[in-house]
Amino acid sequence: MKLTCVLIIAVLFLTACQLTTGEQKDHAQRSADRNSKLTRQCTPVGGSCSRHYHCCSLYCNKNIGQCLATSYP
């Protein structure tokens, strides 16, 4: 009797694991598709900007509203 219960629980557990794994693969694909559609393009050096994160170089001179190249020592 105990062995039968253990086997039934094991089969149910394995079935549930397979079902959730299949759903995760589909969910991951949908998330990747959604993220690729939401990806924003950055502004190249010399382009207009109002925030640092708009620029590919991550440096925006807000006084002139232009993306500048960053120079590191």
UniProtKB/Swiss-Prot annotation:
Signal peptide: 1-22
Expressed in which tissues: Expressed by the venom duct.
Cross-referenced Pfam families: Conotoxin (PF02950)
Taxonomic superkingdom: Eukaryota
UniProtKB keywords: Disulfide bond, Knottin, Neurotoxin, Pyrrolidone carboxylic acid, Secreted, Signal, Toxin
Propeptide cleavage-removed residue intervals: 23-40
Subcellular localization: Secreted
The protein's name in its UniProt record: Conotoxin ArMKLT2-022
Organism: Conus arenatus (Sand-dusted cone)
Organism phylogeny: Eukaryota, Metazoa, Spiralia, Lophotrochozoa, Mollusca
